Amino acid sequence: MKASRRKFLITTIAFSAAGIALFKSSLANAEWLSADFEPGSFDATMKQLLKGKPIVETDKIDLNIPEIAENGALVPITVTSSLKDIKNLAIVVEQNPIPLAIEAVLMPELEPFLSARLKLASTSFVFAIAETEKVCYSVKKKVKVTIGGCGG
């Protein structure tokens, strides 16, 4: 069957319109968290993240991150927790220009688990924060970023 130019153009325009609609909706979804990931102070980031809830240090969050990072551009991190009813998991790096590194919304059916690679600007405390309905739980570890991987 021979395709006509008119049919080809109509099909191309239809797919282009659908693609543009999908692209615009993905941009709208990306904008709702943009304020959280803007440069700012550590204190302002924590205030925005906690939403007025008290913060409690706990040993029920396991923050697995190296104490010495030879390359601050690729620092592996894994967070797990035995706490129940966690709504959000967040990673905050105290000395980074943008302190909020990760914010993950968890479904109730999921185990609280997060694994990623962070970029650390300098030696800093790294916080893992688990938000529940009434309180936020946290744990922190200090990570030393070395220059050139020589330990200094």
Question: What is the predicted function of each stretch?
Answer:
Residues 1-16:
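N-terminal secretory signal peptides and thylakoid transit peptides that target proteins
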Residues 22-60:
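C-terminal segment of N-terminal export signals and the immediately downstream linker at the start
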Residues 70-76:
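Short coil/turn motif common to extracellular beta-sandwich-like domains
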Residues 76-82:
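Short edge beta-strand/loop segments characteristic of extracellular beta-sandwich folds
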Residues 95-120:
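An anionic, turn-rich surface loop/hairpin at beta-sheet edges
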Residues 121-125:
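Extracellular Ig-like/FN3 beta-sandwich strand-entry sites
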Residues 138-143:
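Edge beta-strands of extracellular beta-sandwich domains
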